[in-house]
Amino acid sequence: MERKIFKTTIGGRELVIETGAYCGQANGSCIVRCGDTVVMVNATMAKAPREGMDYFPLGVDYEEKMYAVGKIPGGFKKREGRASDKAILTSRLIDRPIRPLFPKGLYNDVTVIATVLSVDVNISPEVLGMIGSSVALSISDIPFAGPTGSVVVGYVDGEYVINPDLEQRAKSKLHLNLAGTKDAIMMVEAGANIISEKEMLDAILFGHEEIKKIVAFIESIQAEVGKPKAEVELEKIPEDIDAAVRAYANEKMDAVLENFDRSAREVAEDALDEDVLAHFADDFNDVAKKTKFILDSLYYLKKEKVRAKIVNDGVRPDGRALTEIRPIWCEVGMLPRVHGSAVFTRGQTQAMSTCTLGTISEVQKLEGLDEDYYKRYMHQYNMPGYSTGEAKPLKSPGRREIGHGALAERSLEPVLPSEEEFPYAIRTVSEILSSNGSTSQASVCGSTLALMDAGVPIKAPVAGVAMGLIKDTESGKVAVLTDIQGLEDFLGDMDFKVAGTTEGITAIQMDIKIKGIDEAILTRALEQARQGRLHILSKMMEVIDAPRADLSKWAPKIVSFAVDPDKLGDIIGKGGKTINKIIEETGVKIDISEDGTVFIASNDSAAIKKARTIIENIVRDVEIGDIYEGKVVKIMENDKGQFGASVNFAPGKDGMIHISKLSKERVEKVTDVVNVGDTVLVKVIKIDEKHRVDLMLKEVIKRA
C-alpha cells in the first residue's frame, strides 16, 4: 500500500493519521500522532467464525511500552509484564464505543491492538488509541458501522477544554472521556469534582461537536484508502425454526413473565426451555445447531416481550414502576476488628464494604508511562461466584472487576479529606455478596458507609444509581429506568451509572448497546438519576448521617507536622541511625516526605508524643531558656575530681551541667545527685561562641 498522511486540527492541536507504510498484513492499520505522542493501532479478523460461540469475540488491548517514555522496565526480565490497571481501563474505553457497531451474528474473532510508541506528557495517548481504533476498523475490510470519534473534555475556570494538557488536567473539575458517532453519543466515562447535571450535560454536548469533526475526518480517510467490506457469514436463526418456536411458546412465555419474583421466573424459564426442546425433539434434525437456534429464538421472544411491557405498559420484570427503586436496607460496624464496615442492600443486590486506614508509607506506588505517582485512596471490587449462585473457583480480578473498582474509586475521591487534613492511606474493599444488577453502584454506597463508620471525615456522602433504557426502534418510544436489575441490564439498550452527592455528580459511566442516544434522552436520564440518588442517600443517612467522631481503636493513630527540609538529614542520621533509634525507643512508625512533612503512627498516643518531642528537639535551634528532657551519658572529672555531667538532650545534641548547677545547695560529688543513665530535665543557660551548651538541672525524672 502507498503511504498516506492525513491531517486535521482537534482541540487546537494538529492530529496526523498515517496509513499504508506499516503492518501490511493487518486488516486495518494506522499511526496516530499529536505532538510527540504516537500510537499505532492494528485491527485484524479471523477468516472464519469461531465454533461454538454465542457472543461476539472482540478482543481489545492497549499496550504501554516503556520505551515510549525512555524507560527500561523494572524487574529481573527487564520487559513489560502484565498490563497495568490504567492500560486495562483504557482497553475498556476503546472497546465500549466500537462493540455495538459490529453486525449481530458476527462470530469471527476480531482483535484491536493499540500500542503506545511515544508519549508527550501534555498529550494523553489514550484518546489517540480510541481514535486510531476507529480509523483502523473503518479503513479495514472488517464489517463495522462506524466511524466513531473520541475526545477528552476538561472543565477549567468555567470553560470546557478539548483534550486538556497536563496543567489543565491538574486544574480541571472534570475528566470526561467521550465517544460517539456523528449522530449520537456511544460512551461516557467521567470523574468530576461535584458538578451539576447541567454542567455535565453541557460538557457532553460540547465534546460531541468536536466528535462530529473527527468522524467527518475519518470518513474522508475511509473514502480514500478504505477497503471494501468483506462478506462474512453471520449466524442467523432459520426462519422456520423461529416461526415454529414463537407460535408454540408465545402464550407460555407470557405466563413465565407474569412471575415478578426472579427465582420463580427463572425456574419457569428453565421449565419452558425443556418443554420447547422436548416439543421439537423430532423436528429440524437436519439443522446442525438446532438446540442453540431454539434457545436463541426463545431468548429473543423473551427480550421482545420484556421490552414491550416496559415501553408500552410501564411494567418492569419485577413489577416496579419505571422510576421506582428496590427496597434498601443498610448496616454499619458489623466487623469488630475492621476499622470501618458496612453492608448496603438494594433488592437482591448486596455489597459488604470495608475501610482500612494505614500509614502514608502504605500508599500504592504506580509506575507507567506517566511520571511515577502515589495513590493514597484505593478501592477494590470483588464478585465471587456465590453472589450469583454459581459454583465457580476464585480467580484474580478481571477487567470487569478492575473497571468497577475504578468507577467506585473515582466516585468517592472528590469527597475525601486532603492528606494534610487526614494523613492516612485509605483502602476500601467491596465484596459483592449477592448480585442482581447495579453492583458497582452498591459498592459506592457501601464504601461511603464504611468510610463514615471508620471516622474518615468525608466532605459529603456519595450514592450511586444505575439507569437503563429501552428504545423501541419502530415506534420511537423510550423508557428510562431507575435502578436497573440484571435482566433489564441484559435485555436493555443502556447501562448508565451516575454517582454523586446531594450537590452534584462525582462520576458517570455509560455503556450503550444501540447506535447512540441523543440530548433529550441524556437530559431525562440525568434528572431521573438525580432523583434516585437523593432517595438512596436519604436511606443511607438513616443508618449513619455523619462520619464518626473517633477512629476505631484498632486503627493506627497518626500525627503529621512540618519541619525544615534542610534538617531531614539530622532526623535520619548517618545510615538511618538516628531515626532507627527513635523507632526502637518509642515503638512508633515514622515516615518522612521530601517537603519536610513528618508522619508518626502508633496505636499508643504516649509513644507518638514521645517520638514527636524527640524529633522536634532534633530540628529546633537550641536557645537560652529552652527546657529539654535528656539522659546523663558521662560524669565529667579531672585530677581535682568530678566537676560536671554530660547530658544528651536530643540526638546529636549534648550539653554539660556544671557541678554548681546541679543544686542550690553545695554538692561535693556529681554522683551524689546524678549518675550515668539517669533521665533528667534540664534548662539551657548559656551557649558560647563555639556552640557549646551549658545546662542547669531542673529535676531528676528517673534514676538509672
Give a label for each model feature.
Residues M1-A46, E233-D370, P556-D570, T578, ...:
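Extended amphipathic alpha-helical scaffolds
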Residues G28-C30, I123-D141, V332-C355, N436-V456, ...:
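Conserved phosphate/anionic-ligand binding catalytic regions in large, soluble enzymes, centered on
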Residues P228, V232-E239, H535-F561, K609-E629:
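Long, charged amphipathic helices and adjacent flexible linkers at domain junctions
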Residues K104-V110, A145-P147, I214-V232, S263-A264, ...:
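Flexible, glycine/charged-enriched surface loops at secondary-structure junctions
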Residues M1-E233:
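Long, basic N-terminal domains or extensions that often function
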Residues E14, A26-T111, V116-I123, E189, ...:
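Glycine-rich, flexible beta-strand/loop modules in the N-terminal catalytic cores of phosphate-handling
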Residues D141-F260, L451-A549:
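Mobile "lid/hinge" segments at catalytic clefts and subdomain interfaces of large enzymes
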Residues P556, P565-A704:
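Single-stranded RNA-binding regions, centering on S1/OB-family and related RNA-binding modules
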